């Protein structure tokens, strides 16, 4: 999509609007699905869906802002970098959990992270960066993309773009909510009564090193936005068709911090007003998570599997037609 936007349809506003609409739908839908899920791997998969939506919003801003796309160009590239490192961290974390417990349901992996400070810290690196907490790469990238949306809203005076901004902040809040759900379940709740005893040694030296290599750059890049992160993004401007900054970005200015404060507030409201009272239940003295997401709303069952079956039928028909044509050619 980035290549199509930059090289095949440069400056095409209709394409930019289409990408923006797809981005908004994707980032909100993925976040909502993650809030309702109780399976760790499925939550992380929905997280990827949502974060791709954020990236698509940044790609759309590249086109819609035209020559004033410096914020979008830097933010989109850094968002892709952040997404790669965060997902590497969190999926490795999920692998560690599954390797030790052979479970992925939050009700079965509760308390696994208790007494594991290194795993605790590495998870927080990934989660805080994904949530856009200041001091992490995710804050830098999310701030740049958010400010690009704000710039377009001011430039055009469009109510629709203001709605996009609030969808951006809402999705960020939902991100905070489902990450808090995972964090509390794995690191603070007590383990199920029938869970097997977990060893404090949760990974091999190689797996621990892999997790550290993925997680540690997140705060490093977040604490050095001008000296490191922006230089990485600037090296890609010739590819993204972006422009360099005309002035320094003040990441800790209130105007930039305000966005993350709003998202954090939304996230805490969703966690304490939706997840805790409605998506958990107390049974036998234990807090258990439950999923209220309707089965018929499953993307896998209602979209992907039917589409896959349809594609197979189409390909089978094409192959049959090709075979018949070859038979005719042989007969002729």
Please provide the spans of the model-predicted regions.
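Alpha-helical transmembrane segments and their membrane-interface junctions
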Residues: 129-144, 215-236
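Aromatic-capped, Gly/Pro-kinked transmembrane alpha-helices
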Residues: 228-261, 274-332
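Hydrophobic core segments of alpha-helical transmembrane domains in multi-pass membrane transport
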Residues: 30, 127-131, 168, 172, ...
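Hydrophobic alpha-helical transmembrane segments
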Residues: 160-172, 248-269
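Hydrophobic transmembrane alpha-helices and their helix-loop junctions in integral membrane proteins
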Residues: 1-202
């Amino acid at each position: 999509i980035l290549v199509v936007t930059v090289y095949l349809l440069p400056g095409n506003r209709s394409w930019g609007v289409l990408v923006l609409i797809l981005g908004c739908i994707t980032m909100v839908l993925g976040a909502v699905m993650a809030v309702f899920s109780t399976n760790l791997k499925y939550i992380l998969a929905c997280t990827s869906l949502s974060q791709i939506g954020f990236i698509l919003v940044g790609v759309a801003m590249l086109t819609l802002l035209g020559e004033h796309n410096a914020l979008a160009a830097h933010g989109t590239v850094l968002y892709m970098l952040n997404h790669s490192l965060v997902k590497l961290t969190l999926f490795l974390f999920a692998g560690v959990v599954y390797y030790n417990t052979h479970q992925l349901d939050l009700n079965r992996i509760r308390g696994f992270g208790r007494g594991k400070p290194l795993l605790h810290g590495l998870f927080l690196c990934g989660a805080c960066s994904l949530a856009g907490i200041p001091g992490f790469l995710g804050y830098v990238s999310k701030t740049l993309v958010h400010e690009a949306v704000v710039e377009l809203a001011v430039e055009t005076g469009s109510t629709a773009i203001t709605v996009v901004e609030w969808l951006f902040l809402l999705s960020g809040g939902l991100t905070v909510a489902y990450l808090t759900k995972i964090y509390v379940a794995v690191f603070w709740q007590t383990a199920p009564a029938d869970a097997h005893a977990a060893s404090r040694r949760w990974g091999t030296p190689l797996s621990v090193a892999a997790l550290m290599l993925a997680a540690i750059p997140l705060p490093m890049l977040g604490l050095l936005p001008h000296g490191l992160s922006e230089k990485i993004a600037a090296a890609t401007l010739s590819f993204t068709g972006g422009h360099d900054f005309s002035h320094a970005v003040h990441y800790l200015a209130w105007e930039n911090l305000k966005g993350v404060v709003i998202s954090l507030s939304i996230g805490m409201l969703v966690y304490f007003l939706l997840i805790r009272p409605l998506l958990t239940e107390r049974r036998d003295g234990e807090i258990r998570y439950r999923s209220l997401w309707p089965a018929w709303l499953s993307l896998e069952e209602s979209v992907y599997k039917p589409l896959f079956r349809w594609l197979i039928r189409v390909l089978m028909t094409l192959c049959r037609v090709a075979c018949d044509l070859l038979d005719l050619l042989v007969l002729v």
